[in-house]
Structure formats: C-alpha cells, structure tokens
Amino acid sequence: MIKNLNTRKLAVTPSHKKAMMRNMTTSLFLHEQITTTIPRAKEVVRFAEKLLTKAKPADLNAKKAIYADISNKDVVKKVFDVLVPRYKERNGGYTQILKLGTRKGDSAQMAIVKLVI
C-alpha cells in the first residue's frame, strides 16, 4: 500500500534524492538559477522555498536549520546576507520555473529554475 504520494520519486533512492535536493538547492542559491528537468525543478522549488521561509527570522535557530541542509558556509552566508533581506516583504513565491523545451539526447523536458529578484 503506497501512502506517500505527495512527492515525486525521480527514479532514485530516498537518500540519493535528499542529497540531490540539497546539492541542487545549494547551486540555486549560489548561482541564482539552474537548468534541470521539469520534475526535478518542481521538487527543487518545493525544497528551496521551505528553506528560504525557515531562514527568514535570521536568528540562531534559523541558521542552524539552514546549516542542517546546506553545508557550504559561503552559500549560507549569502542566504542570510543577500537572499533573506531581498525576500523580507515577500510571503513565498521566491522561485520561478521557466520551461525550455526538450533536451537533445533523450528528449527530456527541461526547465530553468531561478530566484525571483
């Protein structure tokens, strides 16, 4: 009996998916945009939005929560110095997905995930 239908499987194990979401979110926060497939983009948006919402109080507990998922100190510093002040007045909707078309090799639907300015 399958119960957890709220997330996409993405053809990887749960531990691989967790690591992939952390790595893709780190890249998104560092470069402010990434290119990936549409299902992965939708999952990264969910993960990144939750992290940015957790970071908005900008206190010690928020920093610990962000360090639990993002281990790169430069990215965490950017989150609290650049991104949190940018989205201070915004209640969600920090990212957007732009569809690109299909990838040449395997015809996978591609998208750009970018942080809203």
Which residue stretches match the model-derived regions?
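Short, solvent-exposed loop/turn elements at beta->coil junctions and helix N-caps
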Residues: L98-R103
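Ribosome large-subunit tunnel/peptidyl-transferase-proximal elements
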Residues: M1-N91, K104-I117
